[in-house]
Amino acid sequence: MLTIHTGSQEPPLAVAVDGERIVALGSPDEVAAAYPTARVRRWRGRLGPGLLHEGPLPEAPSARERVHALLRLGATGARAEHLTDPALRAAAQRNNLAVLDRPPSLERGARADLAVFAEDGSCVATVLAGRLVHRRA
């Protein structure tokens, strides 16, 4: 489903996502005009690329919960050296957490890995491969 994500930052930014890929970036007005039938998600916070988690994953009772802890932080990728445990790597794959060696970027054609951050730096929402995987209540 085609979805446009917008943040509340200045200058305004909108990212159009179709499936798991970014199809357009620009001002909310430009992107909405290009995709008038798209669903629009308006987020309160700064929309940008997800974070690359540089260190070991947070401790939690299960591998799934360790990966989910990253999603709550706005991380959309982790380094391979921190995913060597088979259960942890499997949980990362099931959740589409990217294994990266550099921070993700927002560009047309790239995988839609986005995050929205509030003014205090806390994560409002995380999108992995076009799918909303975390939303703060």
What are the residue ranges of the model-derived segments?
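Hydrophobic residues within beta-strands of alpha/beta enzymes
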Residues: 78-79, 115
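Short, ordered loop/turn segments at secondary-structure junctions
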Residues: 28, 57, 82-85
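Short, compositionally biased
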Residues: 38-40, 125-132
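N-terminal metal-binding scaffold of metallo-dependent hydrolase/deaminase domains
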Residues: 1-34, 99, 105-106, 110-119, ...
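Active-site loop-helix segments enriched in His/Asp/Glu that coordinate
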Residues: 80-105
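Alpha-helical segments flanking ligand/cofactor-binding loops in enzyme cores
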Residues: 68-71, 107
